[in-house]
């Protein structure tokens, strides 16, 4: 491959990172929509690839916890999408439904986080630091905890908020190092 061809590809990738997919008239809306769509695509890809992995592992008779063949096959495996077994249209419907649900969750998290960090940066006079990341991570973590199941306890919400704040703050602090 020529060096100029490699440069063109890298320039395209860099321009994709800077360009927004939508122009909704306000930078906040553009950022939320852009983050939502990109993360939803990643979430859908992750959900489908995870289910493909479990389908291959189950079809080959391997235990997903060990590398080799299982000594004893148990029915207690925990799959994220338990209705995805067989070759029926019901199985495909379950895959589409669950992939959509997961991509919506990923998009919600990214859009919410991106919108909160943008809003906090604007409110704080252009300061984008670990405080913005901590607040956005905490609110996003709490929102994600509330969307994952119907019976979410307040302890789970608090734990998810703290985890979101910690991960977001660490990512912000480490981004200046690397």
Curated annotation (Swiss-Prot):
The keyword Membrane applies. InterPro entries: Tim23-like. One of its GO terms (biological process) is monoatomic ion transport. GO terms for molecular function: amino acid transmembrane transporter activity; porin activity; protein homodimerization activity. The chain crosses the membrane at residues 103-119. The keyword Iron does not apply. It is a multi-pass membrane protein. Residues 1-102 are annotated as: Contains beta strands. It is found in: Plastid, Chloroplast outer membrane. Induction: Regulated by ABI3 and ABI5. One of its GO terms (cellular component) is plastid outer membrane. Belongs to the Tim17/Tim22/Tim23 family. Plastid outer envelope porin OEP16 (TC 1.B.30) subfamily. Voltage-dependent high-conductance channel with a slight cation-selectivity; selective for amino acids but excludes triosephosphates or uncharged sugars. Non-essential amino acid-selective channel protein and translocation pore for NADPH:protochlorophyllide oxidoreductase A (PORA) and possibly PORB. Homodimer and oligomers in membrane. This is Outer envelope pore protein 16-2, chloroplastic. The lineage of its organism: Eukaryota, Viridiplantae, Streptophyta, Embryophyta, Tracheophyta.
């Amino acid at each position: 491959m020529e060096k100029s061809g490699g440069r063109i590809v890298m320039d395209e990738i860099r321009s994709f990172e800077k360009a927004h997919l939508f122009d909704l008239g306000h930078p906040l809306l553009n950022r939320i929509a852009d983050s939502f769509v990109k993360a939803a695509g990643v979430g859908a890809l992750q959900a489908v690839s995870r289910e493909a992995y479990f389908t291959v592992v189950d079809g080959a008779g391997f235990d997903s916890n060990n590398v080799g063949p299982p000594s004893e096959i148990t029915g207690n495996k925990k799959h994220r999408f338990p209705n995805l077994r067989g070759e029926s249209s019901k199985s495909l419907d379950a895959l589409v439904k669950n992939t959509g649900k997961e991509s919506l969750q990923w998009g919600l998290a990214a859009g919410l986080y991106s919108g909160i960090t943008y809003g906090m940066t604007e409110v704080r006079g252009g300061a984008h630091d670990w405080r913005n990341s901590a607040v956005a991570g905490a609110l996003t973590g709490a929102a994600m905890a509330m969307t994952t199941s119907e019976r979410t306890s307040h302890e789970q919400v608090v734990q998810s908020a703290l985890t979101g704040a910690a991960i977001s703050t660490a990512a912000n602090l480490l981004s200046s190092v690397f």
